[in-house]
Amino acid sequence: MHSPTFSMVKIKTASQDYLPIPVAVTKASRLKHGRTLKLMTAHGLKIRVKVAEARDKLYMTIGWKEFIQEAGLKMGESKSVVFRTLSKSRLNVIIFNKEGYSRCPIPDKAAKALINNQSSSAPSFSTKSTAPRHPSFTNVEANTKRIVKDMCCYNKRMKLSSEVKNYVRDIAQFLDYSSKFYIVTMKNIHEVRQGDGCYNLKAGYGQISHKIIFKEIYSATSTASQQDTSGKNLHFSLPQDESVAGNSTSPVNAMFMPCTSNILLLL
């Protein structure tokens, strides 16, 4: 292949078991029934899918269901998927939300940020760019030994979705190596109330019960509860005698997790 081929697909099918393969991908990769494709994403997900023919059309079948589950896609979501044909057997997959933004954006300066944040005690990083220079298809891969368990303080009994784990991996390169954060899951933003009593929150690490945190979250979310708050930041400070699981860091930054009800408390 002399140049990469791009093809966008709107995910509208009600089935998780298959996906029609775009004609452009079929031609570029010269696909046939029985072939195998490797789907790859920016956060390192690599899954092989089988190609099958039905009614003169090719579909991704075995492996596609596993891919959408690992990528954090949900039924009923309005998503656009861009396939970038890397070779006859490899496709780079970029997922966009309904507003047209990459669901897991990685800025152009990722490679530079990684180099600047390194220290002699930090693990080695390798960074490479595999995308064309057009800003709409920017994609930087970063390989790091840091894993979710090293960075995220959460109760082991709390099951993290694939999307949350993928988002954690994507933002890891922009945090200091010593940085950790806590995940708080809000069952329903509208159920958070100011005042005394128990708040309808599940804490990711131990039991985060400081009312001032809940009040600040409520204050910041109540005005935006009717809007899409995915990826937006909250900023508030804690008094020195308040803490999150024993950490008295101030100020506290919080971020809404994209497409979830989770909030990150960055410490």
From Swiss-Prot:
InterPro entries xrefs: B3_DNA-bd, DNA-bd_pseudobarrel_sf
Gene3D superfamilies: DNA-binding pseudobarrel domain (2.40.330.10)
Entry's Gene Ontology molecular function annotations: DNA binding
Endpoints of the signal sequence: none
Subcellular location, record wording: Nucleus
Xref: Pfam families: B3
Predominant subcellular localization, coarse grouping: nucleus
Single GO cellular component term: nucleus
DNA-binding region: 4-99
Keyword annotations from UniProtKB, A to Z: DNA-binding, Nucleus, Transcription, Transcription regulation
SMART domains recorded: B3 (SM01019)
UniProt name for this protein: Putative B3 domain-containing protein LOC_Os07g12820
